Design a protein with these regions (language model features):
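Hydrophobic h-region of N-terminal signal peptides that target proteins for export
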Residues: 9-17
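Sec-dependent signal peptide recognition
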Residues: 2-8
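Sequence signature of WD/YWTD-type beta-propeller architectures
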Residues: 19-336
Length: 336
């Protein structure tokens, strides 16, 4: 999820009757349960047995076993760890995202953001992949394929307002490193700032977000074989950030502000909840999944879907915080 200035996250509420003053965690439906009481940016293991997450922004990566509910710290052997994301590879190993050290929030999230490899073997330490990148990454569940975006902050060869999507393979035959890097799409200006999200259709296609001016965004997809790009959300003037994809590749989870049509409030990445979008290119099949934004200051974000489609992990968040900040991981059961 992209980091967005707090100005765009502020909530301009309509009269208080529009949103409840209660705590959304006290009104969870029967298919949602609290998994942890801290943490953010969850990622489900390929075998659906564990959920990795960040303890906090610029902090340690953790993993929780879904049966025992035992939490293990993955990076506590790294002094002053300042990672921002943890994601599973298909091998069960991990990709970490974040800076080498903390300078300040802006510089460390942008210029210094890079990819790391972490073995699943206990006691392993992160290994730099030598790749600066922007925001999050797409990680294949079926291969060692990775995709990420870059802006001029990480790639000085880009024009100041340009961004690009790069697909690469992770080579684990020796010291982990990226090979076969290929730019698959480029935006020339701020009308669309890119962020990779998920592979689907046997890694032949990929979803990504197009961040637009004035705090808006669109759900996009690219056919990696033909280069054809599709706007799946087709809702100009609104916020639609693509998140975890469903295993059938027909639907994706989306952070969206569509509920503001009924609830009021400033549109953008502050007033969001989780929606389900059919990737048929019409932008019409949107279903709301969570209702945290029905409550003053509440939102839910950063959803990921299990590979069997049975559940979703996401986080409880606050409208006034920066994007990605969370206060605990929850599970949403589609089918127990």
């Amino acid at each position: 999820m992209r980091s967005t200035p707090l100005l765009l996250l502020s909530c301009l509420m309509l009269p208080l009757g529009q949103r409840s003053s209660d705590d959304p965690l006290q009104h969870l439906p029967s298919n949602i349960e609290v998994l942890t009481h801290f943490g953010e940016r969850a990622d489900i293991s390929p075998d659906n047995q564990r959920v990795a997450f960040m303890a906090k922004s610029f902090g340690d990566a953790m993993v929780i076993d879904l049966k025992s509910r035992v939490i293990q710290c993955l990076t506590c052997n790294v002094p002053a760890a300042v990672f921002l994301r943890v994601m599973h590879l298909g091998t069960g190993d991990y990709i970490l995202i974040g800076p080498d050290h903390f300078e300040n929030t802006h510089t460390s999230r942008t210029r210094d953001n890079e990819l790391w490899y972490l073995s699943k073997e206990r006691g392993s330490k992160p290994i730099k992949l030598g790749q600066k990148m922007s925001e999050g990454a797409a990680i294949s569940k079926k291969s060692l394929k990775i995709a990420f975006s870059q802006t001029a902050a990480q790639a000085p060869d880009l024009a100041p307002e340009a961004s690009r999507l790069i697909v690469a393979d992770l080579d684990l035959s020796g010291t982990p490193h990226l090979i076969n890097k290929k730019t698959v799409y480029e935006s020339k200006d701020r009308s669309c700032t890119l962020e990779a999200q998920d592979f689907y259709d046997d890694d032949r296609k990929m979803t990504f977000t197009c961040y637009e001016p004035e705090g808006r965004s669109s759900v996009m997809g690219i056919d990696l074989q033909t280069g054809e790009v599709t706007n799946f959300s087709k809702a100009p003037g609104t916020y639609n950030e693509v998140e975890g994809i469903f295993p059938d590749g027909l639907y994706t989870a989306v952070e969206a502000d569509r509920q503001c049509e009924q609830l009021g409030g400033q549109r953008g990445s502050g007033n969001i909840d989780i929606w389900k979008l059919r990737l048929d290119g019409t932008g019409k099949d949107f279903t709301r999944l969570t209702h945290f934004n029905d409550y003053e200051g509440g939102k839910s974000s950063n959803p990921v879907i299990s590979t069997d489609g049975r559940f979703m992990a996401f986080q409880s968040a606050r409208t006034t915080d920066a994007a990605g900040v969370g206060y605990g991981i929850l599970l949403y059961w589609f089918n127990r």
